[in-house]
Amino acid sequence: MIHSVFLLMFLLTPTESYVDVGPDSVKSACIEVDIQQTFFDKTWPRPIDVSKADGIIYPQGRTYSNITITYQGLFPYQGDHGDMYVYSAGHATGTTPQKLFVANYSQDVKQFANGFVVRIGAAANSTGTVIISPSTSATIRKIYPAFMLGSSVGNFSDGKMGRFFNHTLVLLPDGCGTLLRAFYCILEPRSGNHCPAGNSYTSFATYHTPATDCSDGNYNRNASLNSFKEYFNLRNCTFMYTYNITEDEILEWFGITQTAQGVHLFSSRYVDLYGGNMFQFATLPVYDTIKYYSIIPHSIRSIQSDRKAWAAFYVYKLQPLTFLLDFSVDGYIRRAIDCGFNDLSQLHCSYESFDVESGVYSVSSFEAKPSGSVVEQAEGVECDFSPLLSGTPPQVYNFKRLVFTNCNYNLTKLLSLFSVNDFTCSQISPAAIASNCYSSLILDYFSYPLSMKSDLSVSSAGPISQFNYKQSFSNPTCLILATVPHNLTTITKPLKYSYINKCSRFLSDDRTEVPQLVNANQYSPCVSIVPSTVWEDGDYYRKQLSPLEGGGWLVASGSTVAMTEQLQMGFGITVQYGTDTNSVCPKLEFANDTKIASQLGNCVEYSLYGVSGRGVFQNCTAVGVRQQRFVYDAYQNLVGYYSDDGNYYCLRACVSVPVSVIYDKETKTHATLFGSVACEHISSTMSQYSRSTRSMLKRRDSTYGPLQTPVGCVLGLVNSSLFVEDCKLPLGQSLCALPDTPSTLTPRSVRSVPGEMRLASIAFNHPIQVDQLNSSYFKLSIPTNFSFGVTQEYIQTTIQKVTVDCKQYVCNGFQKCEQLLREYGQFCSKINQALHGANLRQDDSVRNLFASVKSSQSSPIIPGFGGDFNLTLLEPVSISTGSRSARSAIEDLLFDKVTIADPGYMQGYDDCMQQGPASARDLICAQYVAGYKVLPPLMDVNMEAAYTSSLLGSIAGVGWTAGLSSFAAIPFAQSIFYRLNGVGITQQVLSENQKLIANKFNQALGAMQTGFTTTNEAFHKVQDAVNNNAQALSKLASELSNTFGAISASIGDIIQRLDVLEQDAQIDRLINGRLTTLNAFVAQQLVRSESAALSAQLAKDKVNECVKAQSKRSGFCGQGTHIVSFVVNAPNGLYFMHVGYYPSNHIEVVSAYGLCDAANPTNCIAPVNGYFIKTNNTRIVDEWSYTGSSFYAPEPITSLNTKYVAPQVTYQNISTNLPPPLLGNSTGIDFQDELDEFFKNVSTSIPNFGSLTQINTTLLDLTYEMLSLQQVVKALNESYIDLKELGNYTYYNKWPWYIWLGFIAGLVALALCVFFILCCTGCGTNCMGKLKCNRCCDRYEEYDLEPHKVHVH
């Protein structure tokens, strides 16, 4: 074979607008084509193997040497089988060729998407069967495929698919495989018999006749082109390029892609003929987007005796992928890895290495993908599209508009009525516009020819966008061009297409012409003067404008386009999104599982009245205004939603899952571990995993499918019951990934698949090798004495609170820097939010800590408790007033009384007055108080009479007795003096008590104020210690001097020294560096905050177990056995002092695990919380005793310290001196465990706490404050007010004689009235029994009455 290379030969004449591609075919009919698809359906797989560089397009414009890189570009999928195509010889009778024999490739239109690559001649030079004659074998020859590519495709006149509209790119091999022809023309179907626009059409095809076209040295270079022209006339061709190919049978690759620069052709023949790397060899000036392609059928018209087999070719779609490429020293790609093929590929790409050692590698973390959907939208009537489905559609300049609100639309149903030729959108995808919700939907429709499609494009400056119709791109818009099918008879065709090609205004001088351009979403100004249809090209219309309209003339001219066979229309769709709920939604049927309530806790896609996204819904407490539906945070993130079901749901982001790859280099096997996640979660979130992983999850293979383990969900591992002692692929939780090697000791015959990886358990059978015990005895050291000690421990429970003004820290007030900082988005907000979250975490941690460890409030102590408690302050003060403390109820009724204050002498006075006449003993009963005689200030009537008589007598007798009778007035005067003394004494006591109350109350207030002040000062010390952030910020502040590559750390210096552009670059370096430093600082704070929170939990446990109780855990509350613990507050934490005792002396004893009766081996006992021991001092053989485990205190073995157990080989058999529990035969008694006498016979001294005074507490010294608090408590206790007793004395005043006389007379009169009323008002009914009335009253006349019979009911 001769090495070949492309020779680029351009057969294009650039001076012409269209190129000459030769004359049309002169044949009146096309060769009949026979389609027998079953003959061509073969299974000859040729999957992509990127490890051999299959289908690799070399990076454009650069080269590499001896390097491995990851590269993002267009590549085929690893393992892609592609689409297989094969050409065949045609029908022949002897030496006469007949019908063409092809597959149905012309109607099999594919999406072009990102392009494709083609494997050509893979089976060349081998032996295969002839397609048309499967029983015939022949040498397989290489043949090149032909392609048809375009932007618009539809049906031929008979309804068969495969017609390309507008300009179409054709890649046509010719010259018996020695050249490739590329041309870009409008393909006009020919109307002859068997032609696309004629009768009996089945398919178009190309062909060549080897006998005449491929004779040695005389190849027909136009054989295939001429055959193609039999089916299509080539019109308006913009170019035709021809590329020569040297004939060979070597496997080669061909590729085609499209960018804004045009269509690019690639081939491995250009540079790397034998390696397979494709290099670009041509760029075709095709700028319309290629959307579709099809394979042009080709048939070889060989004679029947000379039929050959032709190699199949394979087309593989290109995808935007990431590949790991390995470049050789000479610069070619010799192997590659598709990074998205499987998890092992991801591992290689993550480490950019083709050689990875065995191990368990973390590759990435995948965010959970939605496992369902949630949809809520307005329910309304269906949008009415009927106006556009009836009548004659208007011309483009007179388009009709439908505006929809508050309705449900079905755009898919509407478009299904038409044959859509073109669907382009701006700011939205075609799929999204048919599935989203909007506040309004605007639909414009008009008749429009597809041949003028480009005039409606965004960048067009033609008459359509200038004077007829123009869409506004401020909102999402779509433009649809479609053909009305024949069966849609409700729409009638206009006679022709017409449009305005000119619209201008001439000013009043008739010389100045101003074009009147159409505004977006508005009608043309000339629509009022142009009729609904323009009849002839160049029709001219004019209208004189009124002065109000500015004067002058409005002129327009029109153009027409011939009506097509089928009406073609244009649809312009514009949608608007509302600020809240959107009422125009697609007409969809929702299942029950699309409700929020059915998807709680799951990662779902949601669409809520036009607001869509992804997240997890949970029930929450309602916030915000219900009528507004949506609740947002300060960063405009949706955080809550009021559902139609009446509930409020909060929304959070979906979680992420860490992924690891388990790889064994020896066997080249791997498995995937999804850490700490349930398998049901990963199976519903597959879309982001590798393609192989997704395939396994969909297949749900019971052997290699998801396997739940304690470390997460694994794929590619087979569960087994194997145990291994040495594991090179440990997974954690004593699990091991075991590759298929001879070390598994698993016979190959029982393995399901060679090369599998198994899940095994790690068995630590012999971690420590020890000698076998020779007897059931063992020696033991038990403490016999203890010494006390103190363990000091500090636990940090919080960190310094830190807040940073991000903008001030980064920019220091420079406006230029702050402007650039805005380009970093919400970085500063996130920083502050993270720091605030850390501070709140600290507050919650400290609050929870102290809420858990604080002492609960004590209940009041009531009288009656025994002991040495002084409860007198809490008891009510009792006042004794003598034996007669009160009068009887009758006395209270019969006498007037008054209660007065008693300074202390009233009771003595009252007792004295009871011994004789009150009027005579008043002065005798005067009491002494503080040296003064006092009497009560009240006097009864008798005293008043006696003193008044004495006073009057003394006054009246003065003249008769020469003044001697005045002595009779002395009692009266003394009574007045003594009573005034009593009033004064009472007032003095009241005044003294008032002073005591005021002083003691002020003393109590002062004590409480001092206590609060002291407590406040202590809290200030704690707060100062906790919030001391100088050390935390020192590192952050030091970074302000770092230049981070800028010319200076001072922004002001940079602004002063540099121009504007250089300032931006230098300041941006400082911003980037300082933000990085700030981000690292925040990350450190978050870690420290979480660590402190965990320590706070430990401190809470220690307070609850060590301070509030006595711990039984060894080493948890200090060293040794715990006795008591103390805790004090310390900066950023708590300071513990644990008091415990440590063993100081031990004794070595012989012990046994258990004891059994040698005569009855099933009768065995074991110690409870202790040991069976036999000391060296034991003189009697087999004499055993019991001791506790913490202190040596031998005691007899009884049922209280033992329990019956099953016999064990380590138990000691004894035959003599059996302890009591072994003397009985019953072993089924259920003994209740009791506490051992732990401190029995403990000999030790009183704990010495002297060392506690040496603890350095200067960091947080609260001694003075605690003493002050004690003084405050003492002062409060002393504030009890010991008031001088002021008793209550009740004075009774007896009534005078005339009151008693009137009282008695009243009682007698009342008795007489009652007697007369009862005795004299009837006979036989009085209180006197059966006495007659004449015995107590006058006689009444008697009347004789006849008796009457009376019935009493």
Swiss-Prot record:
Its main location: virion. Keywords: Coiled coil, Disulfide bond, Fusion of virus membrane with host endosomal membrane, Fusion of virus membrane with host membrane, Glycoprotein, Host cell membrane, Host membrane, Host-virus interaction, Lipoprotein, Membrane, Palmitate, Signal, Transmembrane, Transmembrane helix, Viral attachment to host cell, Viral envelope protein, Viral penetration into host cytoplasm, Virion, Virulence, Virus entry into host cell. Residues 18-1296 are extracellular. It comes from the Viruses. GO terms for biological process: endocytosis involved in viral entry into host cell; fusion of virus membrane with host endosome membrane; fusion of virus membrane with host plasma membrane; membrane fusion; positive regulation of viral entry into host cell; receptor-mediated virion attachment to host cell. A motif (KxHxx) lies at residues 1351-1353. It is found in: Virion membrane; Host endoplasmic reticulum-Golgi intermediate compartment membrane; Host cell membrane. Residues 1246-1285 are annotated as: Heptad repeat 2. It is a single-pass type I membrane protein. CDD domains: human_MERS-CoV_Spike_S1_RBD, MERS-CoV-like_Spike_S1_NTD, MERS-CoV-like_Spike_SD1-2_S1-S2_S2. The chain crosses the membrane at residues 1297-1317. Residues 1023-1067, 1258-1286 form a coiled coil. It holds the Pfam family bCoV_S1_N. Residues 1-17 form the signal peptide. Disulfide bonds join 185-237, 339-349, 383-407, 425-478, 437-585, 912-925. Glycans are attached at residues 66, 104, 125, 155, 166, 222, 236, 244, 410, 487, 592, 619, 719, 774, 785, 870, 1176, 1213, 1225, 1241, 1256, 1277, 1288. InterPro entries: bCoV_S1_N, BETA_CORONA_SPIKE, CoV_S1_C, S2_sf_CoV, Spike_N_sf, Spike_S1_N_MERS-CoV-like, Spike_S1_RBD_bCoV, Spike_S1_RBD_MERS-CoV. Residues 381-587 form the BetaCoV S1-CTD domain. Residues 907-929 are annotated as: Fusion peptide 2. Belongs to the betacoronaviruses spike protein family. Homotrimer; each monomer consists of a S1 and a S2 subunit. The resulting peplomers protrude from the virus surface as spikes. S1 interacts with murine DPP4. This is Spike glycoprotein.
